[in-house]
Regions:
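A general structural signal for well-ordered alpha-helical segments in protein cores
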Residues: 37, 64-67, 134, 150, ...
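Active-site Asp-x-Gly
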Residues: 115-166
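Helix-rich C-terminal or lid/interface subdomains of diverse kinases
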Residues: 151-152, 156-210
Length: 210
């Protein structure tokens, strides 16, 4: 990733162009996906780059304030949305910002590129932030990795599964799902919105003890 601050004060970022294809949803549980995500989260050069861009850490409270301000009246009519917002208010994660890392923010399979040389890349860094890595981990696992494979995924990534991590993953997946629902509602893509409403309901009903 290459960055440069221009005269307006904005920062331009770029990546080398690579020929290849997107990963399929079924490929997202592969070992190399977990390994690359860990490499990104642990990258000091990437973290320092974001700090040079004067990027401030994104805390759960900031995310919650932003999502509450963005929701339309129509989205708020959905019972699962109101239930999810109550959950978010009652379960705000508490992770020391010293443990925040580079977070991509959109680990959808469309953003994983497998090059002609069988090299894996994570592209589209517009939403990159300094935040809790559980933001990426949660969305990836809930969307693409069967629950019975989570333990193996954690081992590959190099983190010990814990109640705290599971709580944070669920919280961030819920709040990002609400954001997707609002976005699709604004775009009037109601089929996609309903898909995310169903997904949100599944996440809310999973791991009911957290």
């Amino acid at each position: 990733v290459w960055t440069k601050r221009i005269e307006t004060g904005e920062v331009v970022t770029a990546q080398h162009w690579k020929n290849g294809r997107e990963l399929t949803p079924s490929e997202m549980s592969q070992r190399r996906v977990a390994e690359l995500l860990k490499k990104i989260h642990g990258s000091k050069p990437l973290l320092n780059m974001l700090k040079r861009m004067e990027m401030e850490p994104i805390t759960p409270n900031i995310m919650l304030k932003k999502i509450n301000a963005s929701l339309s009246r129509d989205v708020l009519t959905h019972h699962i949305i109101r239930k999810a917002l109550t959950y978010l208010e009652d379960h705000i994660p508490n992770l020391d910002s010293r443990f925040f890392t580079v977070v991509h923010g959109d680990v959808n399979h469309n953003n994983w590129l497998l090059s002609d040389r069988d090299e894996l890349f994570l592209v589209d860094w517009e939403g990159a932030m300094i935040a809790d890595p559980a933001i990426d981990i949660g969305m990836l696992l809930y969307n693409y990795v069967p629950k019975q494979q989570w333990s193996n995924w954690f081992n590959t990534y190099g983190v010990k599964e814990s109640m705290d991590l599971n709580k944070r993953m669920k919280w961030y997946t819920v709040i990002q799902s609400i954001g997707m629902i609002q976005w699709y509602e604004e775009q009037k893509r109601f089929k996609d919105m309903n898909t995310w409403l169903k997904f949100l309901n599944e996440v809310m009903n999973s791991n009911l003890f957290i």
